[in-house]
Amino acid sequence: MAASLGRLTVLASVPHVTANFAPIWLAKDLGYTAAEGLDVTVEIAGSPKDAVEGVIAGRGDLSFVNIVFSFLAYDRGAPYRPFYAFVRRQNRSFSVPETSPIRSLGELRGKVIGLHYDDPELRAFARAALVGAGVDPERDVVFKPLAGSPLDAPKMAAMIRSGEVAAVWQLDVLSGLMAGEGLPLRSLPAPEIDGLTPSSCLEAMEDALAERPAVFAAFGRAVAKATLFALTNPAAAVRFLWQHHPDAGPAPGEDPAHAFRRELAALEVRLASQRIEGAPDPRWGAITEREAAAWQEFLLSTGAIASRRPPAIYYSNALVDAFNAFDPGEVIDRATSSGP
């Protein structure tokens, strides 16, 4: 049994427990955090913005949000630092229904764009992406939050189907959720952002990372194991999550099989971006200076941030060796033996 490392509070950037971010909860549910000597609490913050502000205010130790939040936080003097690359590819895009005639960002002029997660920082990212494509986000488009919560697939699908919005600024998992509702989406090419990596990261305050490195290293290692488990057996990951968190399962009156297919589809979309194979540094949690520099150049060029800094300020790789200090074979064997 590992020595006790104490408590760690994770502020979840979602309205409720969800398979979209299954490894965060599975790190605890599968016993990986306990084996590290960590007493982990995952508190629902409700939104990415609330999670970030909670960590900055000291109400939690870390959250998992898009790396854009860190750049914008530094720009206002809050040293909120990514230390583990959770999603290795770009996970934000503009999408349209598969049957839509819209094929480019330029064709969004005059359209209403639905917002999947309506946070100021994510709006800033959307505006920057449009500016990069030559679209004026203030004059050429209208933004409108999608109906319900960002996890309420039926309500969001109804709004898109009705034509109330022509496109969506979405998190990758929305594609899986909508596919589960019979509404396949197609991402629009966005050369200015498609190559920017990583996207979602584990992020904490600089001083906390310096004061408790063993704690953050242990949690990152547990998340790496849970991610590998989910990659190996996504269906088992959803089942484990539902067993430990019934509120993540079917809504009252909802067909369980339909809900399972939808949640599995969303998780599989997310997991495709969490693979480390092909990443600039193919180790769990790693971020490179070149990646951080590319993000900074994009955000500066589109006016999203005002100040240039050494790229290394925007991330920490100090714990990457610790994240990867485990036997992947043991995790894979467990996942494989956990049923179809």
Features from the language model and the residues they span:
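Extracytoplasmic/periplasmic, Sec-exported soluble proteins
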Residues: 16, 25, 43, 100, ...
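Short, glycine-/small- and polar/acidic-enriched structural segments
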Residues: 2-156, 162, 166-172, 188-190, ...
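Predominant activation on well-ordered alpha-helical scaffold segments within soluble catalytic domains
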Residues: 25, 71, 127, 176, ...
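Secondary-structure end/capping motifs
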Residues: 212-304
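Conserved C-terminal helix/tail region of periplasmic/extracytoplasmic solute-binding proteins
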Residues: 292-340
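Short linear loop/turn motifs
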Residues: 41, 142-145, 255-272, 310-324
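Hydrophobic alpha-helix position signal
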Residues: 27, 33, 73, 130, ...
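Pocket-lining segment of extracytoplasmic ligand-binding domains
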Residues: 155-254
